[in-house]
Curated annotation (Swiss-Prot):
<dbReference type="InterPro" id="IPR003437">
    <property type="entry name" value="GcvP"/>
</dbReference>
<protein>
    <recommendedName>
        <fullName>Glycine dehydrogenase (decarboxylating)</fullName>
        <ecNumber>1.4.4.2</ecNumber>
    </recommendedName>
</protein>
<dbReference type="InterPro" id="IPR049316">
    <property type="entry name" value="GDC-P_C"/>
</dbReference>
<dbReference type="GO" id="GO:0005960">
    <property type="term" value="C:glycine cleavage complex"/>
</dbReference>
<dbReference type="Pfam" id="PF21478">
    <property type="entry name" value="GcvP2_C"/>
</dbReference>
<dbReference type="InterPro" id="IPR020581">
    <property type="entry name" value="GDC_P"/>
</dbReference>
<dbReference type="InterPro" id="IPR015422">
    <property type="entry name" value="PyrdxlP-dep_Trfase_small"/>
</dbReference>
<dbReference type="GO" id="GO:0005829">
    <property type="term" value="C:cytosol"/>
</dbReference>
<dbReference type="GO" id="GO:0019464">
    <property type="term" value="P:glycine decarboxylation via glycine cleavage system"/>
</dbReference>
<feature type="modified residue" description="N6-(pyridoxal phosphate)lysine">
    <location>
        <position position="709"/>
    </location>
</feature>
<dbReference type="GO" id="GO:0016594">
    <property type="term" value="F:glycine binding"/>
</dbReference>
<dbReference type="GO" id="GO:0030170">
    <property type="term" value="F:pyridoxal phosphate binding"/>
</dbReference>
<comment type="function">
    <text>The glycine cleavage system catalyzes the degradation of glycine. The P protein binds the alpha-amino group of glycine through its pyridoxal phosphate cofactor; CO(2) is released and the remaining methylamine moiety is then transferred to the lipoamide cofactor of the H protein.</text>
</comment>
<dbReference type="InterPro" id="IPR049315">
    <property type="entry name" value="GDC-P_N"/>
</dbReference>
<dbReference type="Pfam" id="PF02347">
    <property type="entry name" value="GDC-P"/>
</dbReference>
<keyword id="KW-0560">Oxidoreductase</keyword>
<dbReference type="GO" id="GO:0004375">
    <property type="term" value="F:glycine dehydrogenase (decarboxylating) activity"/>
</dbReference>
Amino acid sequence: MTAHRTPLSELEQAMPFEQRHIGPDHEARAKMLAQVGYGSLDELTAAAVPDVIKNADRLDLPGARSEAEVLAELRSLADRNQVLDSMIGLGYYGTFTPPVILRNVMENPAWYTAYTPYQPEISQGRLEALLNFQTMVAELTGLPTSGASLLDEGTAAAEAMALSRRMGKNKKGLFLVDADALPQTVAVIRTRAEPTGVEVVVADLSEGIPAEVAEREINGVLLQYPGASGAVRDIKPVIDRAHELGALVTVAADLLALTLLTSPGELGADIAVGTTQRFGVPMGFGGPHAGYMAVHEKFARSLPGRLVGVSVDADGNKAYRLALQTREQHIRREKATSNICTAQVLLAVMAGMYAVYHGPEGLRAIARRTHRYATITAAGLAAGGVEIVHGSYFDTVTARVPGRAAGIVHAARENGINLRLVDADHVSFACDETTTRAQVGGVWHAFGVEGDIESLDAEAGETLPEALLRTDDFLTHPVFHQHRSETAMLRYLRRLADRDYALDRGMIPLGSCTMKLNATTEMEPVTWPEFGALHPFAPAEQAQGYLTLIRELEERLAEVTGYDKVSLQPNAGSQGEFAGLLAVRGYHRANGDEQRTVCLIPSSAHGTNAASAVMAGMKVVVVKTAEDGEIDVEDLRAKIDKHRDELAVLMITYPSTHGVFEEHVADICAQVHDAGGQVYVDGANLNALVGLAKPGHFGGDVSHLNLHKTFCIPHGGGGPGVGPVGVRSHLAPYLPNHPLQPAAGPQTGVGPISAAPWGSAGILPISWSYVRLMGGEGLKRATQVAVLSANYIAKRLEPHFPVLYNGPGGLVAHECIIDLRPLTKATGVSVDDVAKRLIDYGFHAPTMSFPVAGTLMIEPTESEDLAELDRFCEAMIAIRAEIEKVGSGAWPADDNPLRGAPHTADALGGEWDHAYTREEAVFPAGVSAADKYWPPVRRIDQAYGDRNLVCSCPPLDAYED
């Protein structure tokens, strides 16, 4: 017998998830606290966080649960969702995700834990996958330049409207929208248009542009192809007429239909937009899915969002990179082409790989089968006396049934099928890749007719107009023909993943990005069909599990932030900003203060802030930043006084983008409120506040949060994300809503800012799980360890690099900025050199030159253990010694391992004529040959790629030596 017998009740307790999520254990924390000079986490954060903002109360959240318990709770919620066969359509369709893509992309941390490919040398796999996506979209749409994804079809259409206004001849003209466009797209366009004064006219364009509209100045035209009703029309006459009137034309096109139909580009369109959801991405109750935009080559430099291009590395080898970044929000701010930052990279990779796996012939076969099911179903209805409204359609059929529509939809539901109730007299249904013969029979039964599929298959002809059938080839590049077997596809995906650097490989200490653990338990439910297979416009009673999860997550986020109401609709942080600013705008206008349009933004703010403010119809006024990194209070006071009557809102990030807790934030908020303005607290840095302070309690009226930062949704290599907006009660009436789901927001809301009612609902179980697993105290400890880790790095590096800013007690918040400018001035070694050299040490670089040029901003998060933190610090200290060798002349300024970084495996062979050794190049201090990460390319020539813009898969001869 042992001296101590552990009670069964203790043996039954699983290790708390908090200990899985937080990297440093108790012993490591004690060492780190000693380095920083504090005795406990509470003592550290008491010194770091200003008293004026501290939250004394514990978070009122349910207690932490084990991983098994949380999965059981989620299973219970999932079981409350009823997944019927969806034939609603409207841009959301059943699809089969090839298991090789599901397992090796969607469920693979090598893909989903990567960051936006700002460091292209260690992002080559993802960039190639995105180039496949761009090539797929460009060739299917017939337009030469496609971006690397947008947020969804609705926002892509709104971006097209903005591009038309920016680049078209009639810049002040109206924007004309096809009445047969998707209703959610029309609503998103209206929401986006109103603040900037764009008039939106919706008209029936089936017979051309109405004369009364043609008499006016038209800036742009949006056509749906095929239409929401299913109609396939020859839109070329409308396109030609629009061009005669000086308007640009956008075609919202279904990519699967385009495998059979003439492309928008061939018909003369300037822009094509849409969604790639039906290319293997689950509906997920609305998202996430990759939207797309393709444009005529003359508009390439005005594209919103990311654009992947081809360049060369230092050895002249082909390499991929993000192209034309100077047009984006993080550089151009209020003059950017868009506020898009996070997009939908992971979903774009999936859609592109779906095309790679199936190839053009496979996509055509899926399209033909989908179309055949539609024609057979329609033929059976017609034979039974049901009037089919349109003679030409692809996958969607509208039937006229006077007074019977509701009854038919109800009967179909009884048969396990969701149809679309158009109005009292019309019902539509959409076929897709998953449609079966049983579903066809179920539709006939709901309409009260009978039919024989075999006989109708023999009799039913094609309904697509011969003049509109596609005749040109598409997806001709070898990548769309080489990976038909699962073995080949599996190895291709592995080969690409091996070229990338993600959290499964090592720490990604990007400041302001919060690259923390995305736990497997949190990720697992995303692929359950009860969450993945639900249509966003399914009846609410079929989504009770989802709606409960959404309500609970909204309430818990409100508790964490101190706000009264939260909307989960925004599907990116940029869209959360836009929604929050629209709420401020709506509030002022409701109070008769239409003149309040000035938005004060510190010069150090995230670039999306300014871009979002302009989209919300506001005038940006920049507030200076003081030398200590905080807002220049005197300049702020002067700007408030100057714009007192016009002041709408102040946008601040807290903690600041300089990584410090500003002590006078409450006073700043009071000054703005005294002038009649609102305070927008950007939630990008909320990982330093959870459990310690609440923006809604220290002066914030509105904030957006980043669930893909603070609440563990993975970054996906550049998306998906979720950017909920939280508001105080007086702004709640002006949150987003949705025309097709009344429960998605207030009747008085500003309209939808995302295509789906709850945005990227399919990934909300991740954040729900994180909060449930951690509980209130666990969330607080995660924050405290994040602050501890940042201060530990700052203390370790401070003897070697100046730490640029600090706050109370000489402490930083959850990130720190090290200043390389003195070293650059003395030695010529740039911040870029240090970032690339870190690759040789096996690290992704911190954030470069933001918010201060020539600096590195480091955010370790709470998830990295002490060994990894030390490995990073030791790499930085070793790099400092290398810089010293350059400064002393031991290595030439133009020939040293920093300037030559990163080094590939090619450095091990061939001639070597450098002033440093091969070993110094590839095995610097502390780097083991056994664990070495080898970058696939050397430093990429950024300027070459922009001068020689290539944004689709290069021909085979480009791969030759």
